[in-house]
C-alpha cells in the first residue's frame, strides 16, 4: 500500500490546477453564475489559522457550487493601503510599498499552499496604480454630484497614529487600531455625504433576507433614526435662537435649563465677557475627558453657566443656558432642552447645579414629588402641568404636541439620524491621493479624469508630524491648474482605506481594464455577490460604506443593482488559550507549520470540523491530531479497497443480501445529509461527521465480510461517491483518489454526487419489544408488516414467552416501525 505523504500530493495537485488553469473563470458561460467572495485581507505580515478559517469556508462554497454546475467567480486580493505600512516605514526605515509587497508575497504563498480555488488572474491590490486610479475616479463621481465636500469640522484625532478617525473608527473613546484615547481637533476635512442615503440604507436592510439579523440590527442602530420635533428657544436679549431636536416634545413644559455641547460655536457667541476666562478653563478640562465616556449615564456631569438665559417658547419662562460635558456636537443639534424630571442625565446635572425639577409626566397610579425624587421618571404616563395637554396620555401627547407646535410656528416635525457624513481625509502618505487641486484664481478644481491616477511619489519623508507627508513634498504639491494653467497646489491628504474596500468587489470583474473601472455588462452579469463571507467586526464600517457606494454608482447609471451582497455569512473566531490570536499574546498558530506537519487537507478539515463555522472555537492540538488520524484511516481504507474496484464500474449493480442493501442505504442517506448540511446553512462540521460515519460503515463491512464475498460494484460506488463528497473539504486527497481510481479527468471538474431516493427506502426494520415497561427483546421484520403478523411473530419468540409465562395479555401496543409494548 502506498504511503500518505500529504506535502508531495498537495504540491503535485496544486501545480496541475495552476498549469491547467482549472479555476480561471470565463466572463460568460451557459451555466448559471455564482460569485463567492471572502473579505480580502490587510497584508500586515503572515496569516494565522484564524484568517485561514475565512478562506477555507469560502473555498468549500466555491468548490461545491462548481460541482453543482455553476460558473463560479472566486477571486482574491489585498486591502493594501493603510497605517501599519507607514508605521513600519517610520520604525524600521522600510518604504511602505516595499513592506506591503513583501507581505503580499508571503500571504499569496500561504494561501496557495492551502489549495484554495482562487482565480489568480484576477488578483488585485488596492495600492496598485491600476486600482487606485479608479478609487480616485469614484471620488470624482461623488464630487461632481455634490456627494463629496470639504468643511471645517471637529474631528476625532489619534495622537499616536497622528491622523483623524471617522466616528466608526472610535470605540469607547479610543482609536480602534491602537487603543489610544482620542482627542478633538478642528480641521478642514473631506467628507462623503452618506447622510443623503440614510433612509435608503435603513429601509433596504429589509431586502437583505440573506443577511444575519444581528448584523442588520447593528447597521440600524448605527444609522439611528429618530422621529421627533425641532424647536427654537429664543435667547433673551438677542436675535439668536437655540435649536434643539427632541424625541420627547411631550416634556416641553418641564424644560428648566438649556445645555450646549462644549464644541458648539454658540458657546463663544453667548458667554458673558466676564466669564470668558473661566469658560476657557472649563473647556480645556472637558477636552481632556474621554468624549464618549463623558456622555454615559454613570459619568460625572459637569457644566458651566454662560450667564445667559433662553425663553421656553411654550411657557415663556426664563431658563439658564449651560455648557455641559455630556452633550456631543454630533448628536442632534449639539444643544439639548434639559428636562430633569424625565431624563436621568438631566436629573443628575440639575441636582448638582441646583436647577429646578418640574414634573410634567406622571405615572397612571401615583403622583411624583420633585423634592423627593431620587431618579428621573422616564416612562410613559399622563401629561400634567402641560397647559392645554393636561390629562393627555404621553404616548398620544408626542404626536399632538408636534401638530400644535407646527400650528403655532414654534417648531416642526423632524427626522434625525445618528449617522454622520463619512470623514474620508487622512493625514498620511500610504493611501490613495484625493484628486483635487487648489488654484487661487479658480478655487477648488477636480483633477480631470484623463489625468488620473494622481500618483503617490516614492521619495517621501515619513515624519510623524500630524500633517500628511505629501504636504512636505514640493514635487507632488506644486502643479498647474487644469482650468487656467496657473500655479496651483494639490490636496495632500489621502483617502480613508475604507474607500478602497468600498468597491473592490466590482473591480474583480475586470481587474486589468485600463479605460474604465469595470465593464457595465460584465459587472451587471456577475453582481451582486451571491455569497459574501467575513468577520462580524465589519458589520458597520465596511458593509455600510460598500452599500452606500453601490447605491451611488447605481443612481449614476453605472450599475443595475443597488445592494452589493445578496447573502452574508459571518464566521466565528478561532481562539488559543482562551484568547484571540495575536503576536503580542504569543498564541498564534501558523498554518505553515500545520501544513508542514499534517498537510493542508488535515488543516482544512480540522478548521471546519472544530465547531459550526459561525461559532467561535478553541484551537486544540489534540483535535487536529484526531482529524489527521481519520485522514490516514481513510487513506488506508481507500487503498485496501482500490485493487478490488480499479477495473470495476457501477453498471448493473446487484445487491445480494440485506447487509449490502443496508450499506448502500447508508451511503445514499449520508450523501443526502452532506448535501443538505452544505445547502442548509453551512453545517460543515456535521457534513464532515457524515464523511467519517461513511468511512466507519465501509470499514465495518470490509472487516465483517470475507474478501471473496465483497460486492465490488457496490464498493466502487462507495469510494467514488466518497471521493466526490470529500473533494470540497480535502481537495488534494480527493484528486489523488480520483486519479488512482483510473480517471483521466480531475475530480474538481466532476458533478456533485447524487443520491438515489430508492436506495433510501428501508425494507426491514428492527423493532424493540417492551414487556411491562422494560425492553426484553428485539426483532427484525419487513417494514410494511401488519400488526397481526407482527403479533404472531413476537409472541412465538422464546424471550417473550419467558416473560409472558402464560399470563393473560392485557394490552399489545405497536408503534409502527419502532416498538411493541406488551402489558401482562
From Swiss-Prot:
SUPFAM superfamilies: Anticodon-binding domain of a subclass of class I aminoacyl-tRNA synthetases, Nucleotidylyl transferase, ValRS/IleRS/LeuRS editing domain. It holds the Pfam family tRNA-synt_1g. The keyword Kinase does not apply. A motif ('KMSKS' region) lies at residues 580-584. Coiled coil: none annotated. A motif ('HIGH' region) lies at residues 41-51. GO terms for cellular component: cytosol. PROSITE patterns: AA_TRNA_LIGASE_I. One of its GO terms (biological process) is leucyl-tRNA aminoacylation. One of its GO terms (molecular function) is ATP binding. Its EC number is 6.1.1.4. It is found in: Cytoplasm. Keywords: Aminoacyl-tRNA synthetase, ATP-binding, Cytoplasm, Ligase, Nucleotide-binding, Protein biosynthesis. It comes from the Bacteria. It catalyses: tRNA(Leu) + L-leucine + ATP = L-leucyl-tRNA(Leu) + AMP + diphosphate. It is an enzyme of class 6 (ligase). ATP binds at residue 583. InterPro entries: aa-tRNA-synth_I_CS, aa-tRNA-synth_Ia, Leu-tRNA-ligase, Leu_tRNA-synth_edit, M/V/L/I-tRNA-synth_anticd-bd, Methionyl/Leucyl_tRNA_Synth, Rossmann-like_a/b/a_fold, tRNAsynth_Ia_anticodon-bd. Belongs to the class-I aminoacyl-tRNA synthetase family. This is Leucine--tRNA ligase.
Amino acid at each position: 500500500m502506498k504511503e500518505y505523504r500529504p506535502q508531495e500530493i498537495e504540491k503535485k495537485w496544486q501545480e496541475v490546477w495552476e498549469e491547467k488553469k482549472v479555476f480561471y473563470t470565463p466572463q460568460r458561460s451557459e451555466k448559471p453564475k455564482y460569485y463567492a467572495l471572502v473579505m480580502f485581507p490587510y497584508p500586515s505580515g503572515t496569516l494565522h489559522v484564524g484568517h485561514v478559517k475565512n478562506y477555507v469556508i469560502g473555498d468549500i462554497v466555491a468548490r461545491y457550487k462548481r460541482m453543482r454546475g455553476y460558473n463560479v467567480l472566486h477571486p482574491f486580493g489585498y486591502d493594501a493601503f493603510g497605517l501599519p505600512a507607514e508605521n513600519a516605514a517610520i520604525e524600521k526605515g522600510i518604504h511602505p510599498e516595499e513592506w506591503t509587497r513583501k507581505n503580499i508575497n508571503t500571504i499569496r504563498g500561504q494561501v496557495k499552499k492551502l489549495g484554495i480555488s482562487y482565480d489568480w488572474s484576477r488578483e488585485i491590490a488596492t495600492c496598485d496604480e491600476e486600482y487606485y486610479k479608479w478609487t480616485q475616479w469614484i471620488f470624482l463621481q461623488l464630487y461632481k454630484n455634490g456627494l463629496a465636500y470639504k468643511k471645517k469640522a471637529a474631528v476625532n484625532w489619534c495622537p499616536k497614529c497622528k491622523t483623524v478617525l471617522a466616528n466608526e473608527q472610535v470605540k469607547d473613546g479610543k482609536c480602534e487600531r491602537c487603543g489610544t484615547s482620542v482627542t478633538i481637533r478642528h480641521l478642514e476635512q473631506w467628507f462623503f455625504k452618506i447622510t443623503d442615503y440614510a433612509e435608503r440604507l435603513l429601509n433596504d436592510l429589509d431586502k437583505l433576507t440573506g443577511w444575519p439579523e444581528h448584523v442588520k440590527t447593528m447597521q440600524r442602530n448605527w444609522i439611528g433614526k429618530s422621529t421627533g420635533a425641532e424647536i427654537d428657544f429664543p435667547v433673551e436679549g438677542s436675535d439668536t435662537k437655540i435649536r434643539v431636536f427632541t424625541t420627547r416634545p411631550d416634556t416641553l413644559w418641564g424644560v428648566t435649563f438649556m445645555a450646549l455641547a462644549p464644541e458648539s460655536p454658540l458657546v463663544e457667541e453667548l458667554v458673558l465677557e466676564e466669564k470668558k476666562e473661566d469658560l476657557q478653563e472649563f473647556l480645556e478640562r472637558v477636552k481632556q475627558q474621554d468624549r464618549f465616556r463623558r456622555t454615559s449615564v454613570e459619568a460625572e456631569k459637569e457644566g458651566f453657566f454662560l450667564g445667559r438665559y433662553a425663553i421656553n417658547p411654550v411657557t415663556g419662562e426664563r431658563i439658564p443656558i449651560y455648557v455641559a460635558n455630556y452633550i456631543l456636537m454630533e448628536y442632534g443639534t449639539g444643544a439639548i432642552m434639559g428636562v430633569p424630571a424625565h431624563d436621568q442625565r438631566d436629573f443628575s446635572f440639575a441636582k448638582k447645579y441646583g436647577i429646578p425639577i418640574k414634573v410634567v409626566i406622571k405615572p397612571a397610579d401615583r403622583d411624583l414629588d420633585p423634592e423627593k425624587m431620587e431618579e428621573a421618571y422616564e416612562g410613559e404616563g399622563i401629561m400634567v402641568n402641560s397647559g392645554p395637554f393636561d390629562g393627555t396620555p404621553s404616548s398620544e401627547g408626542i404626536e399632538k404636541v408636534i401638530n400644535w407646535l407646527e400650528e403655532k410656528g414654534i417648531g416642526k416635525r423632524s427626522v434625525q439620524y445618528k449617522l454622520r457624513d463619512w470623514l474620508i481625509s487622512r493625514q498620511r502618505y500610504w493611501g490613495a491621493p484625493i484628486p483635487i487641486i487648489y488654484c487661487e484664481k479658480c478655487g477648488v478644481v477636480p483633477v480631470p479624469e484623463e489625468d488620473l491616477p494622481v500618483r503617490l511619489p516614492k521619495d517621501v519623508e515619513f515624519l510623524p508630524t500630524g500633517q500628511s507627508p505629501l504636504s512636505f513634498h514640493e514635487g507632488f504639491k506644486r502643479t498647474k491648474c487644469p482650468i487656467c494653467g496657473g500655479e496651483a497646489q494639490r490636496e495632500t491628504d489621502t483617502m480613508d482605506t475604507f474607500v478602497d474596500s468600498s468597491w473592490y468587489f466590482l473591480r474583480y470583474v475586470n481587474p486589468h481594464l485600463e479605460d474604465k473601472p469595470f465593464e457595465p455588462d460584465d459587472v451587471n452579469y456577475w453582481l451582486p455577490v451571491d455569497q459574501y463571507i467575513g468577520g462580524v467586526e465589519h458589520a458597520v464600517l465596511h458593509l455600510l460604506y460598500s452599500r452606500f457606494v453601490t447605491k451611488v454608482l447605481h443612481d449614476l447609471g453605472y450599475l443595475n443593482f443597488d445592494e452589493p451582497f445578496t447573502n452574508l455569512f459571518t464566521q466565528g473566531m478561532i481562539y488559543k488559550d482562551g484568547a484571540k490570536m495575536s503576536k503580542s499574546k504569543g498564541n498564534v498558530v501558523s498554518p505553515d507549520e500545520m501544513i508542514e506537519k499534517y498537510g493542508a487537507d488535515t488543516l482544512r478539515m480540522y478548521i471546519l470540523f472544530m465547531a459550526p463555522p459561525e461559532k467561535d472555537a478553541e484551537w486544540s492540538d489534540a483535535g487536529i491530531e484526531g482529524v489527521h488520524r481519520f485522514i490516514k484511516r481513510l487513506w488506508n481504507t481507500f487503498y485496501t479497497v482500490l485493487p478490488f474496484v480499479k477495473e470495476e464500474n457501477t453498471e448493473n449493480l446487484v445487491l445480494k443480501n440485506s447487509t449490502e442493501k443496508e450499506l448502500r442505504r447508508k451511503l445514499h442517506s449520508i450523501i443526502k445529509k452532506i448535501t443538505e448540511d452544505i445547502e442548509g446553512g453551512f453545517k460543515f462540521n456535521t457534513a464532515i461527521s457524515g464523511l467519517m460515519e461513511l468511512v466507519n460503515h465501509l470499514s465495518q463491512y470490509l472487516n465483517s465480510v470475507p474478501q471473496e464475498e465483497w460486492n465490488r460494484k457496490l464498493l466502487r460506488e462507495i469510494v467514488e461517491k466518497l471521493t466526490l463528497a470529500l473533494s470540497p473539504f480535502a481537495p488534494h486527497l480527493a484528486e489523488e483518489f480520483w486519479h488512482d481510481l483510473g480517471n483521466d479527468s480531475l475530480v474538481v471538474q466532476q458533478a456533485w454526487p447524487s443520491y438515489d431516493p430508492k436506495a433510501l427506502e428501508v425494507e426491514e426494520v428492527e423493532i424493540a419489544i417492551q414487556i411491562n415497561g422494560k425492553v426484553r427483546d428485539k426483532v427484525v421484520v419487513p417494514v410494511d408488516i401488519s400488526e397481526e403478523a407482527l403479533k404472531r411473530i413476537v409472541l412465538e419468540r422464546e424471550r417473550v414467552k419467558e416473560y409472558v409465562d402464560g399470563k393473560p395479555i392485557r394490552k399489545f401496543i405497536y408503534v409502527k416501525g419502532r416498538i411493541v409494548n406488551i402489558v401482562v
